[in-house]
């Protein structure tokens, strides 16, 4: 448990890597040191300084765990309370949840969905148009999750859409009167 060594796979058809997500199976209440190696070649090596990984026992509630970075290796030091623990770069946002968000948002009269194309994996690239386009209205673009490891952006978009599509929110109604 004191010398688990891992490396991060490169993104699909790319030389970049930064994001990780894995499950540890072990005895509970035993201290572990998980070393993620070769990070000086990652997409953003400076991002590992003062970084804290996230962990979860149920894949719903995530919490931060202490880490140390020596310039090339990230050491996650943690004593799990249960036999199965999930670790990630940031709280994962599953493709299933992504599809649920798209399905939910298109039920609003203020939102429509368009397919712009496909990813390298053959999945739809979706555009959500929120509001009713009219001459004189401003057009605002918000992009998120353009890279595989940017799960935090989709969490932001989920909250953004919940607020923007809330029929009882005065600020959202005002924004949609002024912009699309």
What is each of the regions a protein language model found here?
Residues 1-180:
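M14 metallocarboxypeptidase catalytic domain recognition
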């Amino acid at each position: 448990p004191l010398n688990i060594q891992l490396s991060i796979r490169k993104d699909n058809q790319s030389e970049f890597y930064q994001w990780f997500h894995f499950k540890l199976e072990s005895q509970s209440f035993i201290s572990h040191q998980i070393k993620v190696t070769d990070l000086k070649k990652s997409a953003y090596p400076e991002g590992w300084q003062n970084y804290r990984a996230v962990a979860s026992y149920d894949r719903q509630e995530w919490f931060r765990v202490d880490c140390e970075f020596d310039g090339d290796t990230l050491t996650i030091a943690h004593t799990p309370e249960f036999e199965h623990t999930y670790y990630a770069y940031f709280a994962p946002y599953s493709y299933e949840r992504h599809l649920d968000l798209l399905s939910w948002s298109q039920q609003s009269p203020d939102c429509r969905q368009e397919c712009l194309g496909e990813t390298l994996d053959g999945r739809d690239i979706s555009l959500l148009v929120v509001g009713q386009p009219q001459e004189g209205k401003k057009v605002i673009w918000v992009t998120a999750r353009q890279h595989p490891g940017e799960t935090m952006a989709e969490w932001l978009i989920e909250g953004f859409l919940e607020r923007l599509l809330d029929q009882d929110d005065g600020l959202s109604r005002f924004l949609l009167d002024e912009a699309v």
